[in-house]
Amino acid sequence: MVTAFLVLAIPTFESIGYYFEHAAGAGPAKIRYKMADAKEWREGYPPVYDPREKEYRGSLVGLAPDTEYEVELQAGAHRASVRSRTWSERFRVTKTTHLKGGVSDQTVRITEGGSAAGWHLVEPAPGSRFVSDVFNLAENNVVVEADYVILRGLELINAGVHAVLIRKGVKHVVIEDCHITGWGRVGGARVWGVVGGSDSAVYAEPGAGHLVIQRNLIESPRGGANDWESGHPSGPQGITLIDSAGGNVIRYNTIRSTEDHGFNDGIGGGSNYSFQGSPNRDSDIYGNIVSHCWDDAIESEGANRNVRIWSNYIHHTFVHVATAATAMGPLYVFRNVFGESRVSHQDRTGGMMIKTGMNYINIAGERVSTGLGYRFIFHNTALQPNGGLDVFSSHELHNAVSRNNIFYSRGRAYPRDAGEPRNDFATDLTGGYLGGGFVKSMFLQSERLEWFLAPAMNKIQWGRVESERGGKTVAITDPVVAAKNPAVDAGARLPGFNDGYTGAAPDIGAFETGLPAPRFGREAAPGFTRAAWETQR
């Protein structure tokens, strides 16, 4: 039976968010997809049904750019399909503005945009290096007031507030291959009277969206956020989106600083407990290195409707990924690496890997929960020592699904049961004594940011163990023995998320033996080449 669903597919470079409207819901649904010219279908991870919106929705991930896909949903006897083409990584440019090489102390204001048929590119003149250094005498290096604009290869220094300001409602802006440093006011706790919170390398005002922020080096703001010993951190941020229109991709950036010039959030925004927020909907955050944050490395809070966060390396932070709230969902957090977490300069105890939370707001006189969206948390690897103390924060949590994660933590793994709708946690490795042994031996040594699983690991075999050595019986108490790595081939199959596993079952954690490792940071971007600010010295 073919039903006339109202269907919608919203692509990015490597993902498609899909929406199939169905007034009553027809029970659990199945999703499958294929390249439009292919014969073989692939199974996707099942969608969720949201009775509030009367629709099935979910995401397909790991897709190829600039490729047409056919997506089919089946719910009971009902079936519907839609075609969608992922974004091309090549932007058609019909107007180019070359900025004269050298140092400029004037704000660049972009008031002329392009269109869907052709973008307006702003870049240094060929063979030159353009530096905007406004010496803290202007609030911004660049102000974007038009749609379909590309900023490429610029060096932006010493903005008084935000280095790049994207005005309210502006859409379709690409910021790529830029170096941004030294922006913002002095940070610090609000109880000290400091008001310079959220000064950002890239700041998008409400309603802006469809932003691509990629391959940038964002580092060392002028000020620094306070740590938790003086209250909630407040200070500079790398990227901030305020009540975005959605459709954003933030990928392959390196966002870093020092502890004394640390960020509040690396990637963040607002409004948190809302049905909009940052990045709001149909957005991807992947391939980034984010560090030196006193609150959240990645803050994805608000609607989180078909938001995907994957393959990020996160360290020197308090919270790795913040998700309070996830009002609509689904939010997918998968194959990230969670490194060092700390509370303050003095307290290295650690925060939490995933912040949750919700509240109730009044909409048209109705009390509405902001905590009913699904969170899918798959195949992440948490490192120790000095990683997050707890996996989840202690806030009320519903509709969280966790699978195949290495959650090495010294504190609480899962939050208390808050009743219906319930969470679903399974096939994770949790605790501070994983596998009953020496956790470091679980991973193969590497000089790169990768943590593939060793086939075997060391563990303590408790008790008195006798063995034959040289014809004699020798008894050893609590010997260290080699044992099978408990993360190898121990995961659950998750269609669309781990189809390419190479063993008897998927490995637990972010790295699958026999497959390429996730790569992080701007230099890991496919086809990466150095920008003029690196080559024209």
Question: Which residues fall in each region the model found?
Answer:
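Surface-exposed loop/turn segments connecting beta-strands in extracellular beta-rich domains
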Residues: 130, 138, 154, 158-160, ...
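Recognizes extended acidic, P/S/T-rich segments that occur
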Residues: 30-66
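Extracellular beta-strand/beta-solenoid scaffold signature
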Residues: 135-142, 158-167, 189-205, 226-242, ...
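Extracellular beta-strand-rich solenoid/capping regions of secreted or surface-exposed proteins
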Residues: 62, 104-121, 131-173, 195-207, ...
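C-terminal accessory segments
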Residues: 438-532
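Predominantly extracellular beta-rich ligand-binding scaffolds that present long acidic/polar faces
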Residues: 308, 314, 330-477
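Structural beta-strand segments of beta-rich domains
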Residues: 14-18
